[in-house]
A protein has these predicted regions:
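Substrate-agnostic recognition of the 12-TM MFS/MFS-like secondary transporter fold
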Residues: 17-37, 63-101, 118-177, 236, ...
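Helix-loop junctions on the cytosolic side of multi-pass membrane transporters
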Residues: 139-144, 181, 185-214, 404-418
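C-terminal transmembrane bundle of multi-pass solute transporters/carriers
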Residues: 61-66, 73, 77, 84, ...
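Transmembrane alpha-helix termini and helix-breaking/packing motifs in multi-pass membrane transporters
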Residues: 38-49, 106-111, 167-187, 261-262, ...
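A single, central transmembrane helix in multi-pass transporters
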Residues: 26, 30-38, 42, 53, ...
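Juxtamembrane intracellular "pre-TM" segments in multi-pass secondary transporters
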Residues: 2-19, 205-238, 422
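Structural signal for membrane-spanning alpha-helices in multi-pass inner-membrane proteins
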Residues: 40, 102-109, 172, 176, ...
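Extracellular/periplasmic helix-loop-helix junction of adjacent transmembrane segments
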Residues: 38-71
């Protein structure tokens, strides 16, 4: 990352390039959330149409497994490419690929030709794109601002990400219910154009020192080495993995089943439930922006308590309002924890390693999610979904608090003398 003197526009916050990128990302992410909600709903319909309800949990998780396995194989390459090459071009190429996937699935839905294997194959192809997109997207934000504004920029980026959840799922619920699920995919394809335009206007990263440029050409293992040696970063990656194992499958994989089977919700009501989750996520992101570093550990512990309580509440909910309020609480807790974890990891990452460190942090999500999703889906097929939610709360509490008790006292984001050089 360049210094403020090398990047004058970054001396003020927010600057022009950062704002343009945020606008483009906001439009694109709204489309992505629309497609995500429609995808989960379409899978429930296809499973019911093909008489595969006995395997609904596993089939809901199968696309995530396909995507996650591909990303697990390619994430090191994606992180290295983000450090070595122009992140703008990497992101633009990924947008083009995702436009093609969205249009293809939309056409299959429109012609009534969609089957479960189409969704699984498309997810695997999207995994290739995401392997390169995620590290580049995470690493480009700190390059657009001065070093002292990195935490603010990451908080705004997370707030935009979560704010789109207020619009995307609700809009998708309306489109699916009124016009058909294919329109969520078509509009998602169109939304990528906004981000491509924004990326085209961003300045190139100024060259670093000779030493920094040499380090950018290093191996993918440098990211692992940094995280392993820096205890606060390691703690945050461990907490991200804990969320992936016990919380994200509930939000990403099991929510369509929960809404359709347990709450008897319509597509529009499913969209409103996701809107509740988005509202909580935005609230958590805004909290992070106003949080002093000294309060980070307390905020993480509070977020864990909120998330555990919300999972228990969801396991008992009997109506949409109850479930919606539980999702708000769950999202506040999770977004606070995940946002702080990503901020701390990015703050402590050397500029020349940021792409590879971002890939390691991303691994704690996409590396564990496919297996967690399959296990959760399988357990949902064997036991009642509500029992799975309760079990997730217990496991999340035990492992999460254990991590915080052992290494969580050093999560202020400040560099300690013994790790500053790592």
């Amino acid at each position: 990352m360049s210094s403020p003197s090398a990047h004058p526009a970054a001396e003020r916050f927010p600057n022009g390039p950062f704002m343009r990128y945020m606008v483009g990302e906001g439009i694109s992410m709204t489309g992505t959330w629309m497609q995500g909600m429609a995808l989960g709903w379409v899978m429930t319909e296809v499973v019911a149409r093909d008489g595969l309800q006995s395997y609904e949990g596993l089939l809901q998780a199968a696309p995530h497994l396909a995507s996650g396995v591909v990303m697990l194989l390619l994430f090191r390459l994606g992180g290295a490419c983000a450090d070595r090459h122009d992140k703008r071009l990497i992101l633009q190429a990924c947008q083009v690929a995702q436009i093609g996937f969205a249009l293809a699935i939309g056409q299959l839905i429109a012609h009534g030709a969609l089957h479960t294997w189409h969704l699984i194959a498309a997810a695997a192809l999207l995994g290739v794109s995401s392997s390169f997109e995620m590290p580049a997207a995470a690493a480009i934000v700190p390059e657009l601002v001065a070093k002292e504004n990195v935490a603010k920029a990451i908080s705004v980026d997370r707030a935009v990400f979560h704010a789109t959840r207020l619009v995307g799922p609700a809009a998708a619920g309306y489109l699916v219910g009124r016009y058909g699920a294919e329109w969520a995919f078509y509009l998602n394809a169109a939304s990528f154009v906004a981000l491509m335009i924004a990326l085209a206007t961003l300045p190139r990263r100024p060259p670093g020192t000779a030493e920094e440029e040499q380090k950018r050409q290093g191996g993918a293992g440098e990211g692992f080495r940094h995280v392993r040696q820096d205890k606060p970063s390691l703690a945050m990656v461990a907490l991200l993995a804990t969320n992936t194992l016990f919380v994200f499958p509930v939000i990403i994989v099991l929510l369509p089943i929960y809404a359709r089977s347990d709450l008897k919700a319509t597509a529009e009501q499913m969209g409103l439930l996701m809107l509740c989750s988005g509202l909580g996520s935005v609230s958590g992101s805004l909290l992070i922006m106003a949080l002093r570093p000294a309060l980070r550990r307390l905020a993480i512990l509070t977020g864990m308590v909120l998330a555990c309580g919300a999972l228990v509440s969801l396991s008992l909910a009997t109506g949409l309002v109850w479930a919606g309020l539980s999702l708000v609480s769950l999202a506040v807790g999770v977004s606070t924890l995940v946002g702080l974890a990503n901020t701390i990891v990015q703050e402590r990452s050397p500029a020349e390693l940021r792409g590879r460190v971002s890939a390691v942090a991303g691994l704690s999500f996409f590396g564990f999610l496919p297996f967690a999703a399959i296990i959760m889906g399988w357990m949902t097929d064997l036991f009642r979904l509500r029992n799975v939610l309760l079990g997730s709360a217990v496991c999340y509490a035990v492992i999460g608090f254990l991590v915080m008790l052992t290494v969580g006292s050093r999560v202020t984001g400040e560099q300690e003398p013994d790790t500053a050089g790592n």
